Amino acid sequence: MGNGMTKVLPGLYLGNFIDAKDPDQLGRNKITHIISIHESPQPLLQDITYLRISVSDTPEVPIKKHFKECVHFIHSCRLNGGNCLVHCFAGISRSTTIVIAYVMTVTGLGWQEVLEAIKASRPIANPNPGFRQQLEEFGWANSQKLRRQLEERFGEIPFRDEEDLRALLPLCRRCRQGSATSAASATTASSAAEGTLQRLVPRSPRDSHQPLPLLARVKQTFFCLPRCLSRKGGK
């Protein structure tokens, strides 16, 4: 059931019920608060502050009604210098859904982008279809309404969470988020290179009016690879 709890943001961890009772992990990651979200959550350690929510991992369960309480709990913990672990039974669906809702609130990112970033370090993260639909319904408008409530209660959000989350995205995903100028330059260079390749690679008369799939693959590989390598080398 995974290889231990996963750090999503400074002060925010995602895991399963084994992680939540592992004193070595809890101590190493300095966990001070735990959200237990499964069928029968029970507090285990006296030195940790718990939020217990009884929720089954079934698509029809209205998990989004717990978003506000969980978001406030996590945010208060982080602002006070604590570390919060959000866990369910397997650390796959329920806990991931709660973490996504929090990250959406403090960053303004969409749930799919947040999930992609989480999967980069925790591939098993996978909300069930019903929870995904509820995250979609939560959306930008509701998450930003909740953000305003956080700021009214706690003040301006001091974290650089969006930057931290984007750093988790796969390199090629970040390549696609380049500036419009870079994209335009790449398009121009791509067209020129494709023309060169087409002149170098002979084609039969039958193919003279059809694009070559091989050339498309070569173009995609050679124009993404240098950018990814340069980003990776710059770390």
Swiss-Prot record:
From the broadest rank down, the organism's phylogenetic lineage runs: Eukaryota, Metazoa, Chordata, Craniata, Vertebrata
Q: SUPFAM superfamilies attached here?
A: (Phosphotyrosine protein) phosphatases II (SSF52799)
Tyrosine-protein phosphatase domain segment(s): 4-144
Q: Does the keyword Transmembrane apply?
A: no
Database matches in Gene3D superfamilies: Protein tyrosine phosphatase superfamily
Q: Does the keyword Transferase apply?
A: no
Annotated protein name in UniProt: Dual specificity protein phosphatase 15
Return the similarity comment.
Answer: Belongs to the protein-tyrosine phosphatase family. Non-receptor class dual specificity subfamily.
Q: How does it sit in the membrane?
A: Lipid-anchor
> Reaction(s) catalyzed by this protein?
O-phospho-L-tyrosyl-[protein] + H2O = L-tyrosyl-[protein] + phosphate; O-phospho-L-seryl-[protein] + H2O = L-seryl-[protein] + phosphate; O-phospho-L-threonyl-[protein] + H2O = L-threonyl-[protein] + phosphate
Xref: Pfam families: DSPc (PF00782)
- Induction comment: Down-regulated by nerve injury.
Q: What GO biological process, any one, is recorded here?
A: regulation of oligodendrocyte differentiation
EC number annotated for this UniProt entry: 3.1.3.16, 3.1.3.48
Please give the organism.
Answer: Mus musculus (Mouse)
Functional note: May dephosphorylate MAPK13, ATF2, ERBB3, PDGFRB and SNX6.
Q: Where is the active site?
A: 88
Lipidation sites of kind N-myristoyl glycine?
Answer: 2
Q: Which UniProt keywords apply?
A: Cell membrane, Hydrolase, Lipoprotein, Membrane, Myristate, Protein phosphatase
